[in-house]
Structures are given as C-alpha cells and as structure tokens.
Amino acid sequence: MDPHQSPADNAASPTKSVKATTKNSSTNNNVNSNNSNNNSNHDILNFNDNYTTILQHLANDHPNILREKGGSQQQQHQQQQQQQQQQQQQQQQQSLDTLLHHYQSLLSKSDNAIAFDDNVSNSADHNGSNSNNNNNNNDISSPGNLMGSCNQCRLKKTKCNYFPDLGNCLECETSRTKCTFSIAPNYLKRTSSGANNNMPTSSNSKRMKNFEDYSNRLPSSMLYRHQQQQQQQQQQQRIQYPRSSFFVGPASVFDLNLTKHVRLDNVDQIQLSKTLSLRKVSPTAQFILQDDFDTTLHSKQEYEVDLVENLVHPHGHLLVEIFFKLIHPFLPILHERVFLEKYSRSYRELTAPLLASIYSLALQYWDFHPALLGFPKPDVTAQLNNIALETFYARVGRPKLSIIQTGLLILQCRSECHNNWVLCSSVVALAEELGLGVECNDWKLPKWEKDLRKRLAWAVWLMDKWCALNEGRQSHLILGRNWMIKLLNFDDFPLNSPTILNSLQNDQSGSSPSSSNDVKNHQIAFGNLPIFNINPTLEDFKNGTLMFQQMVSLSIILGEIMDTFYTQGSMTINKSIEQVLKLAKPLQLKLREWYHSLPKNLSMSYATPQKLNSNSTLTLAYFATEITLHRKIICALNPQTPKELVQVCRTAARTRLVAAIEFIRDLKNEHINAFWYNCSTGNLMLIGTFAALLYVTSATKEEAMIFRDYVRNYTWVLKIGSKYFDKLSNALNNMHLLFAQIPGLLTDEPVVVSPNSNINSVNPQRSGVQSQIPIQFNVGSPAMTEQGSPLNQWKNLPQEILQQLNSFPNGTTSTTTPVNPTSRQTQLESQGSPAINSANNNSNNTPLPFAPNKSSKKTSQSSPNVTPSHMSRHPPSNTSSPRVNSSTNVNSNTQMNASPLTSINETRQESGDAADEKTAGRERTANEESSTELKDDNPNSNQETSATGNQTIKMNDDKNVTINTRETPL
C-alpha cells in the first residue's frame, strides 16, 4: 500500500453504496444534466460527489422535502422507491452520514469550491466530474485535508504535509508530537481582518443557506449522533497516546544492513504497518515503535489513577513536594520539570503505578512536614504498594521510560521485602528492551532524554547488583559486554531542583508552609520534640546527586567482587587461599581508593543538628562491600593454610566487623530518619551474618566466645534501635530466624567448635575489642608452634601471680613490642574510619546504647573477655583503656585516624562497670605476654621483612607468600 494513501480509500462501503445508487439513477442524471445550469447548488453537488442520487434517496424517506407540483409523477415511482428503500436501507444510512460529514467540511474547502464555481463549464463531461469527485474523496479521507493545516503548522506558519498512514504531518512527526486540529484554518482566514474576507460572496451565502436549510430538515437523532461522534473525535485528537519502543538488537531480523537500503522519511522512519514503524536514531541503533494504546486502556488508566489519588486526597501535592525534596535527589530517575508540569495540569496525565509509588515513599516522611502535623497519617501504604505492583505488571508489555522509573521506585518501596528478584529482573528486561545499556551520545535525541537514559541505566545497574547480593542471585548485567554506558558526570544531572528552588524562594518571602520560621514555632509549641528541617538547599541537592554517583561507583566494585568470587563458575575455580588473595588484592585497592576519594560532605562527620543526613546509607554500603570481600577470604581458609596467614586474614575480618558494629551503634536521629537505599536492610543483615560466620569458623572455644559476644551485642543494638527504625527491626527479625538454630550463639548452651573449622586461628587478644592486633605486627613468630598459642600457658599459673600481675599499672610492663615506625607513619597518614568518625560527630543526640552482656558472670572463668570495652553501655571515652598493651597503644591522633582498610587500634575505657574492671588485670597480662610472643626478634626466623614493609612467609611447601603489611592483610 502506498504510504501516502489514506486508509479511508480502502473503506469501500460508503463509496460502493454511492456507486450502486449512481448506476440505478444514471438515467435521471443524464436527463437532469441540461438543467444543471439553473441549479443553484450545482457547484456544491459537484464538489465532492454526485449527491443528487443521495438526495433522491433522502426524499424517499422524507417525501415532503423535495415535493413538487407533479404529484402524479411521484405516485408512479412510489412503489419502486419503496422497494429500493428496503433493499438499500443500510447503505443509505451510511450515505447520509457521509453526506453530513461532507457538508460539514464544505466550509474548510470554500477556496476549492469557489474555484469549481468559477471554472466548471455547463457542458462538462460526466466522466471528468466523476474523476474529480474521486480525487476529492481521497483528500477528504484524511483529517489533515478535512481541517487544513494542523495547529502546530498553523502557529509556525509552515506548510502542513499530512501523511495518513503515519497519523501525523511532517513537522509534527519531526518534533515527535501529535497532529491536532481545532478550527478550520481556511474559515479563520475568511473571518479574519480584510475587506475582501469580511464581505461574504454570493456563492458562500448560497452554500450556507442551503446547508442550514438541509440541516434543519434532518431528524434530531441524526444530528445528535453526529455531534457525539464529532466530540469523540476531538477528544481523541487532544489525547496524545504514547507509543511503545523496542530496541532492535544486532541479531534481530531487522538487520541494520537491510535497513540501510530502505528508503526512510525525513524523520528516519518507515511505516511497516498501520501500528508498527521502524525508526533509526543512529547509524548503529534503531527502534520498533508500536501504537498499542487505545481509548479502552486510557479509560482504565484514568480509573486506576483516580483510585490512587483518592487514597491521599487532598494531600497529594504535599507528598509530591516531599518526594522531590527528600528522595529524588538521591535517586534522580525522573525528569522533575516534566513531571511537575503534567501534575500541575492534571494528575491523570501520570500513570497509576508511578503516582502510587511516589505517594508511598513520601508517606514515610509524613510526620516531618509542618503542614501535615495536624492531620493523621493515612494508613494506605500497603494499598498503594499493591496497586503499584499490580498495575506495573499490567504495563510490562508496553515498554517506556516511565515503566522503568516505576519499577525502580517500586523496588525502593519494597526495600523490606526479601523476594524482589523477579521484580528486579523485570526492570532489567525492560531496560534491555529500551536499549538503556547502549551508549546514546550520538543518537538523534534531545539532551535531556540522553541524560535521563544514562541516569536510568545506572540506577538499574545499582538495583541489580545490590539485589543480587542481598538475595544471593547471579547478576544479569556485565560491564563491557551487555552494559556499555559511560560513567555519570556532573553534566548528566539537572543544575537544580524546581521544587527545592521554589521552596527556597518561598522561605525568603515567608509564604512557605514549611519555612524555617514555622519549624521554630512548631518546635517551641512541642517542647523538646525534635523537629527536623526538611527544606534542603541547592547544595544539599548537589550532594544527593553526588551520593548517587558514588553509590554507582561502589556498585561497580561490588559487581566485580560478585563476578570474581560468587558466580557458579568462579566458586569451582577459585578455591585455594592463595588464588583468592591474589584476586582479592586489586579489589581491596579499589575499595581503598574509592573510600579515600569520598568528598568531605559525604563523610559521617559532615552533619548538622536537626537536619536529615543520608551519608549513613553510603557508609553502610561500603561496609557491606568490605564484608562481602572478606567473607570469601574467611571461607577459603582451611587446615592446611599457614598459621600466620590465617592470623592475618582473620584479624582483617575482625577489624571490619568491629568497625561496622560501631558504625551502627553510633547512628543518630539525623541518620535514621533520612533517606536509605533499598539495599540497607540486607546490608544490616550481612554484618550479623559475618559475625556468625567468624563464630562458627573459630578454631578455639575462647575465640568462638569472643565472636559470640559480637553477635549478641549487635543483636542488642538492633533491638534497641528497632523501636524507632524499621530497617533495624526487619534485619533483627530475619537474622534471628537462622541464629536461633545455631547452638550456643544466642543461648547459653555450651560452645561447640565445629570439626570442619579446624583452622589454626590466632587466639584474639583478650583486651577490649577496640584493641585489635595491628596488621603491622611481625607475623611468623617461632612461639606460634604446633603446641598452640602461648596464651594457653597462662592457665597453669597460680592465682596469686595473676593477682600480682593485675596490680601492674597500664604501660609499665616490660614485655612490649615496638611498633614499626614505617607502619605507624602509614597509620597516621591513613584516612579515618567511617565508624570512628561517626563516634566523634558533633551532635546533641545520644548514640544507641549497647546492652550489658547478661552471660558475662557465667562465662568469666573460661573467657575473661566476655564484655568487650567497645560494647559497654557507657559512652566511649578518648582515654586509653588499661586493657590495651603498650604495643598497640598509639597516640590519640593515630586512634582517631585509623582506617578500617588497615586496622582499628582504638582504645576506650569503661567508666562505670566495676565488675568488668576486676577481670581487666588478667586480660591485660595475657595480652602483654601475647604481644611479646608475637614479636619476632629471632634473626633465624623463617620470615623476611623487606624495606618496603612487605613480609614474606615461607610456607611448608617452600613457597613464599608476600604480604604487604603496610596497607592491607591481603
């Protein structure tokens, strides 16, 4: 079919009826041809078709309309006309509708009608008139010819070239808009200013008079039906139905080499069928566009979005404001200006799942908006989530960017659910359908759409990686294979947020309902109730977009860790500890580089009282990534692993665990009530899982009890915080399901060391948990023989000697180990740990307390260090703990700047627990002796320390393993 041919040309029913009628009355037409000169309506009848026969059939239904004086002649033909009426009743009805349609379009065709009126000869050939009529029928079939130029072309004053098969003119198709027709332009021209146009011609007046007379004689039902059809057509023209897009891959049947030989239109598009078109956006990328939206789906969509709006009415606009202030800066996946423009016109221009997910996320901050303090929070979050999920799956078959935005927001709403993998996979599949994994810089798209596609692509990547980690699945996206997007930069984000900018302007004028003055007034009215300032600045908006960039960068490192160690193939290959350490080393360096490159405004120390701070969600993600890497290292240890290597690996793992637990303990209200990514609950569970893993892999009972205390204190932190933080509550409940099944972990059952964990593990220092064994110690001490750790020898000492050792003051014991100056300098230069920095933030809020260990008295004989100092219920102190030996005591600056990437050499003092102080002497003495034994002063030792700080360990099979103790145990 010719692409420029109207679909109405193929609709044969109206045309056939007219032709059939023409054959039956051809004799009458020839007879009346001589009288056509005297017919005042001759120009009208010849304009579109031979309407004389149609009028005759119309007269059959209404004989009074065209009644003449020759009544006897009418009676002769009455029986014949009645028979024709019964046979062609349906065809006549269609002809009447066509006649009405043609008469209505006469006004827009007046210019052509005038030409016909002036040039048509009285002796015109009948065949020639029929050919003109057929051409006019083709022109009338398209809306562009019915109404003239479309609104867009009329405003631009350009020629409107309408293509019926495309449904658009050339200008509208280029600008990707829908042709709309409101008022006939030719009629506007006639009524516009001008002397000639203001004076009606005789032919125009005749046409108008005949049209009015004829329309007055028509039945009222026909006019009503025609008016109703006209209103429906105008309503459909106003609605711009979006088309679904499908990216055409290189292996598709629509091969690029074939489409190169296809003739495209001016917008690089070809119409494949009535509902399908192929569009090339670049020499190497093309899409299939499908018209799969109709009035039925539109009506259903309006019903669904009305249902969503009624659940939160009349507070929908405030929830949208909350979303773009507190959530969207950290998840910038919407085009804010376009969204607000549509929402300001009507919420019906948005889809139900998108609006429901936005309302659901904003309801979390209902109590923080001053304008909503006097209203009860609607209990509709579950309803909104269900509507969003159901309507989302109903639209999966029609891929659009808005569907991906909806899926990402639903994943954020379902952050506490543990079965999001199917939903996440659907979002990834939709991203592949739209080609988000392909670089679009050279595509023929506007810049705002390119930027939006890049942000959406990396948001899908982020969701896929963290969901795969938390649910133990294989990630679908592989960087460099099916994901070829460049990293985000500052130019890919909007310069500002219209919502935040408008709020700041209202604050300056004092007209905002949530201005700072109102916040102060509410704070005075409610006493000491903490009222947070939810009005972010433009700097906060930039920090939010910067956090999104850093989260994407961290997820790339996480993706490498998952692909290296947690795929089915890698788990069967990378089993030996040597191979694992070799592969883990570059990943550890990338993590360190990422942490050191964090700007100050994303650190835990960057906080303002009574202002929400979301930096904690980024720090938690960093700890989860570190733990994910060290989980593999711990699982790779086996009984054949050298003792020194086991000691280094487990010490590094213990360091990460302690830092993560302290980080959660020191969270403040500004962090808890701020935005958290959907992976945060799973990351909280990873910390507890890692502690339990170290517990079950402990080689000795004493070490197992230490990690058991870590697990118990961490669960106590979650229990205290769960009263006002749902993520802590959900993490605690999910952890308890498994931990309760492990003997001795949460109960006072005897600790049983698993026979499979027959690892020559180092016995952890019996001082406070903060006094870690530094990574800079000299490993491979000859005292660590097959007979076990020298700490076991202290059990045979008399009780009197132990009491005398307890009386020694801290730091006076002679058995000290000097710290390597090079290693100490490296420590001083290292960046502070996020956990340590979080403990020293300047804030008025009290950190979460730790619970006292209820089983400390029962197990004090077998494990002196039951309640570590860092787990104390009291606030941490900056003074050195008496439990820490002098070999691990570094100055206070070193303690405050120790990075979790090297070691945590923190020392804190308990300030109110006399029972724990009684056991401090025994622990201190054991630690001092352990430090002395770990020190290697024997030049004949089987280890070598290079000038750069690298230590080479000679293994049993004469293989050397080099460990860089200046940087990391890896």
Curated annotation (Swiss-Prot):
Role summary: Positive regulation of genes required for catabolism of GABA (UGA4, UGA1, and UGA2), urea (DUR1 and DUR2), arginine and allantoin.
Pfam families assigned to the protein according to its UniProt record, in alphabetical order: Fungal_trans, Zn_clus
Residue ranges of the region described as Disordered: 1-44, 64-95, 118-140, 807-970
GO function terms (MF aspect): DNA binding; DNA-binding transcription factor activity, RNA polymerase II-specific; transcription coactivator activity; zinc ion binding
Protein location: Nucleus
Cell inner membrane in keyword set: no
Residue ranges of the annotated DNA-binding region, renumbered to this chain: 150-179
GO cellular component, one term: nucleus
Keywords of the record: Activator, DNA-binding, Metal-binding, Nucleus, Phosphoprotein, Transcription, Transcription regulation, Zinc
Compositionally biased region (Polar residues): 824-836, 858-870, 895-906, 939-954, 961-970
Domain of life of the organism encoding this protein: Eukaryota
Protein name, per record: Transcriptional activator protein DAL81
Any one of the GO BP annotations: positive regulation of transcription by RNA polymerase II
Residues with the Phosphoserine modification: 833
Bias type Low complexity, positions: 15-41, 73-94, 121-140, 807-823, 875-894
Gene3D superfamilies, per the entry: Zn(2)-C6 fungal-type DNA-binding domain
Note: Present with 704 molecules/cell in log phase SD medium.
Compositionally biased spans, kind Basic and acidic residues: 907-938
